[in-house]
Protein backbone atom coordinates (compact mmCIF):
# COMPACT_ATOMS: atom_id res chain seq x y z
CA UNK A 1 0.00 0.00 0.00
CA UNK A 2 2.79 2.43 0.83
CA UNK A 3 3.94 2.22 -2.82
CA UNK A 4 0.57 1.89 -4.53
CA UNK A 5 -1.12 4.92 -2.97
CA UNK A 6 1.48 7.54 -3.98
CA UNK A 7 1.65 6.02 -7.47
CA UNK A 8 -2.12 6.29 -7.84
CA UNK A 9 -2.20 9.90 -6.68
CA UNK A 10 0.85 10.92 -8.74
CA UNK A 11 -0.89 9.58 -11.84
CA UNK A 12 -4.38 10.87 -11.09
CA UNK A 13 -3.44 14.39 -10.00
CA UNK A 14 -2.01 15.17 -13.45
CA UNK A 15 -5.57 15.07 -14.76
CA UNK A 16 -7.67 16.04 -11.74
CA UNK A 17 -7.55 18.97 -9.30
CA UNK A 18 -10.29 17.68 -7.01
CA UNK A 19 -8.62 15.96 -4.05
CA UNK A 20 -11.95 14.70 -2.71
CA UNK A 21 -12.69 13.01 -6.02
CA UNK A 22 -9.24 11.42 -6.08
CA UNK A 23 -9.83 10.14 -2.55
CA UNK A 24 -13.15 8.65 -3.64
CA UNK A 25 -11.49 6.87 -6.59
CA UNK A 26 -8.63 5.58 -4.45
CA UNK A 27 -11.01 4.36 -1.74
CA UNK A 28 -12.91 2.39 -4.37
CA UNK A 29 -9.71 0.73 -5.60
CA UNK A 30 -8.70 -0.19 -2.04
CA UNK A 31 -12.14 -1.49 -1.14
CA UNK A 32 -12.51 -3.67 -4.23
CA UNK A 33 -9.01 -5.16 -4.25
CA UNK A 34 -9.16 -5.78 -0.48
CA UNK A 35 -12.32 -7.88 -0.73
CA UNK A 36 -11.88 -10.91 1.53
CA UNK A 37 -12.84 -13.26 -1.33
CA UNK A 38 -9.79 -12.17 -3.30
CA UNK A 39 -6.80 -14.35 -2.58
CA UNK A 40 -4.79 -13.63 -5.73
CA UNK A 41 -6.47 -10.74 -7.59
CA UNK A 42 -5.74 -8.26 -4.82
CA UNK A 43 -3.35 -5.39 -4.03
CA UNK A 44 -0.37 -7.78 -4.01
CA UNK A 45 -1.12 -8.62 -7.65
CA UNK A 46 -1.10 -4.91 -8.55
CA UNK A 47 2.20 -4.38 -6.75
CA UNK A 48 3.72 -7.36 -8.53
CA UNK A 49 2.67 -5.94 -11.91
CA UNK A 50 4.15 -2.54 -11.09
CA UNK A 51 7.40 -4.18 -9.98
CA UNK A 52 7.63 -5.93 -13.35
CA UNK A 53 6.74 -2.80 -15.33
CA UNK A 54 9.39 -0.78 -13.54
CA UNK A 55 12.00 -2.70 -15.51
CA UNK A 56 10.52 -1.67 -18.89
CA UNK A 57 9.30 1.87 -18.23
CA UNK A 58 11.77 3.29 -20.76
CA UNK A 59 10.01 1.33 -23.51
CA UNK A 60 6.51 2.47 -22.58
CA UNK A 61 5.09 5.44 -24.48
CA UNK A 62 2.12 6.31 -22.25
CA UNK A 63 3.10 5.20 -18.76
CA UNK A 64 0.01 6.82 -17.23
CA UNK A 65 -2.26 4.74 -19.48
CA UNK A 66 -0.50 1.56 -18.41
CA UNK A 67 -0.61 2.52 -14.72
CA UNK A 68 -4.33 3.27 -14.87
CA UNK A 69 -4.93 -0.01 -16.70
CA UNK A 70 -3.14 -1.85 -13.89
CA UNK A 71 -5.18 -0.14 -11.17
CA UNK A 72 -8.51 -0.77 -12.89
CA UNK A 73 -8.10 -4.05 -14.81
CA UNK A 74 -9.46 -6.24 -11.99
CA UNK A 75 -11.54 -3.59 -10.23
CA UNK A 76 -14.61 -5.76 -10.76
CA UNK A 77 -13.83 -9.41 -10.07
CA UNK A 78 -16.45 -12.07 -9.42
CA UNK A 79 -15.58 -15.69 -10.14
CA UNK A 80 -19.17 -16.40 -11.23
CA UNK A 81 -19.16 -13.64 -13.87
CA UNK A 82 -17.94 -13.68 -17.48
CA UNK A 83 -18.17 -9.89 -17.74
CA UNK A 84 -15.50 -8.81 -15.24
CA UNK A 85 -13.25 -7.17 -17.82
CA UNK A 86 -16.08 -5.28 -19.49
CA UNK A 87 -17.44 -4.11 -16.14
CA UNK A 88 -13.98 -3.05 -14.95
CA UNK A 89 -13.52 -1.13 -18.19
CA UNK A 90 -16.85 0.63 -17.72
CA UNK A 91 -16.04 1.45 -14.10
CA UNK A 92 -12.75 2.98 -15.23
CA UNK A 93 -14.51 5.06 -17.89
CA UNK A 94 -17.04 6.31 -15.36
CA UNK A 95 -14.34 7.43 -12.90
CA UNK A 96 -11.94 8.90 -15.44
CA UNK A 97 -14.68 10.83 -17.28
CA UNK A 98 -14.53 13.50 -14.58
CA UNK A 99 -10.83 14.14 -15.26
CA UNK A 100 -8.77 15.54 -18.14
CA UNK A 101 -7.24 12.17 -19.04
CA UNK A 102 -7.51 11.62 -22.80
CA UNK A 103 -6.39 8.06 -23.60
CA UNK A 104 -9.61 6.55 -22.28
CA UNK A 105 -10.22 4.17 -25.17
CA UNK A 106 -6.67 2.83 -25.02
CA UNK A 107 -6.98 1.98 -21.32
CA UNK A 108 -10.40 0.42 -21.87
CA UNK A 109 -8.93 -1.75 -24.63
CA UNK A 110 -6.07 -2.81 -22.36
CA UNK A 111 -8.49 -3.81 -19.60
CA UNK A 112 -10.74 -5.80 -21.94
CA UNK A 113 -7.67 -7.45 -23.53
CA UNK A 114 -6.93 -9.20 -20.20
CA UNK A 115 -9.93 -11.45 -20.90
CA UNK A 116 -8.11 -13.56 -23.52
CA UNK A 117 -4.63 -12.00 -23.71
CA UNK A 118 -4.78 -12.06 -27.49
CA UNK A 119 -1.95 -10.56 -29.52
CA UNK A 120 -2.19 -6.78 -29.78
CA UNK A 121 -0.51 -4.27 -32.08
CA UNK A 122 -0.15 -1.62 -29.37
CA UNK A 123 3.28 -1.81 -27.74
CA UNK A 124 2.12 -0.39 -24.38
CA UNK A 125 -0.68 -2.95 -24.26
CA UNK A 126 1.83 -5.74 -24.81
CA UNK A 127 3.94 -4.71 -21.83
CA UNK A 128 0.81 -4.34 -19.70
CA UNK A 129 -0.56 -7.76 -20.67
CA UNK A 130 2.80 -9.44 -20.16
CA UNK A 131 3.14 -7.97 -16.67
CA UNK A 132 -0.28 -9.42 -15.84
CA UNK A 133 1.00 -12.90 -16.75
CA UNK A 134 4.48 -12.53 -15.23
CA UNK A 135 3.49 -14.81 -12.35
CA UNK A 136 3.27 -17.73 -14.79
CA UNK A 137 7.03 -17.54 -15.25
CA UNK A 138 7.87 -17.45 -11.55
CA UNK A 139 9.75 -20.20 -9.70
CA UNK A 140 8.02 -23.56 -9.24
CA UNK A 141 7.22 -22.85 -5.60
CA UNK A 142 5.85 -19.37 -6.36
CA UNK A 143 3.76 -20.79 -9.18
CA UNK A 144 2.36 -23.46 -6.88
CA UNK A 145 1.39 -20.75 -4.40
CA UNK A 146 -0.31 -18.82 -7.22
CA UNK A 147 -2.35 -21.88 -8.25
CA UNK A 148 -3.30 -22.46 -4.59
CA UNK A 149 -4.61 -18.88 -4.30
CA UNK A 150 -6.52 -19.11 -7.58
CA UNK A 151 -8.16 -22.33 -6.37
CA UNK A 152 -9.20 -20.55 -3.15
CA UNK A 153 -10.86 -17.82 -5.21
CA UNK A 154 -12.84 -20.51 -7.01
CA UNK A 155 -13.60 -22.56 -3.91
CA UNK A 156 -17.36 -22.32 -4.52
CA UNK A 157 -16.83 -24.75 -7.42
CA UNK A 158 -16.41 -28.51 -6.85
CA UNK A 159 -13.09 -30.03 -7.93
CA UNK A 160 -14.37 -31.62 -11.15
CA UNK A 161 -15.80 -28.31 -12.39
CA UNK A 162 -12.74 -26.31 -11.39
CA UNK A 163 -10.46 -28.85 -13.07
CA UNK A 164 -12.45 -28.64 -16.30
CA UNK A 165 -12.31 -24.84 -16.35
CA UNK A 166 -8.65 -24.68 -15.39
CA UNK A 167 -7.66 -27.19 -18.10
CA UNK A 168 -9.39 -24.99 -20.66
CA UNK A 169 -7.40 -21.96 -19.46
CA UNK A 170 -4.08 -23.83 -19.45
CA UNK A 171 -4.58 -25.28 -22.93
CA UNK A 172 -5.50 -21.86 -24.32
CA UNK A 173 -2.33 -20.37 -22.80
CA UNK A 174 -0.14 -23.19 -24.13
CA UNK A 175 -1.67 -22.95 -27.59
CA UNK A 176 0.32 -19.79 -28.40
CA UNK A 177 3.36 -17.88 -27.08
CA UNK A 178 2.50 -16.67 -23.57
CA UNK A 179 4.33 -13.34 -23.79
CA UNK A 180 4.19 -10.69 -26.50
CA UNK A 181 7.31 -8.60 -25.79
CA UNK A 182 10.93 -9.61 -26.25
CA UNK A 183 11.73 -8.62 -22.67
CA UNK A 184 9.12 -10.83 -20.99
CA UNK A 185 9.60 -13.64 -23.51
CA UNK A 186 13.31 -13.93 -22.74
CA UNK A 187 12.72 -13.51 -19.01
CA UNK A 188 9.77 -15.85 -18.43
CA UNK A 189 8.56 -17.84 -21.48
CA UNK A 190 10.50 -21.08 -20.88
CA UNK A 191 9.72 -21.23 -17.18
CA UNK A 192 6.07 -20.32 -17.79
CA UNK A 193 5.73 -23.15 -20.31
CA UNK A 194 7.27 -25.55 -17.78
CA UNK A 195 4.94 -24.38 -15.00
CA UNK A 196 1.81 -24.60 -17.12
CA UNK A 197 2.67 -28.05 -18.46
CA UNK A 198 3.44 -29.28 -14.96
CA UNK A 199 0.09 -28.03 -13.66
CA UNK A 200 -1.65 -29.54 -16.68
CA UNK A 201 -0.22 -32.96 -15.80
CA UNK A 202 -1.66 -32.73 -12.28
CA UNK A 203 -5.15 -32.05 -13.67
CA UNK A 204 -5.53 -34.56 -16.51
Model regions: which residues?
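Histidine- and acidic-residue-rich, metal-dependent catalytic cores
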Residues: 88-120
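Active-site metal-coordination segments of metallo-dependent hydrolases
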Residues: 35-48, 77-90
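Short, surface-exposed helix-loop/turn micro-motifs enriched in polar/charged residues
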Residues: 41, 60-67, 80-84, 99-103
Amino acid sequence: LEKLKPLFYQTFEKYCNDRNYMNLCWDEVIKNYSNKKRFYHNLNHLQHMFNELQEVEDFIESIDSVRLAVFYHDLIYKVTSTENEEQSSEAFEKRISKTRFEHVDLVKEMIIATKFHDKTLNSDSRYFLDSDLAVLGSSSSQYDEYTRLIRKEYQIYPTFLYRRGRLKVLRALLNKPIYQTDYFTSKYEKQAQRNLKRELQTLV
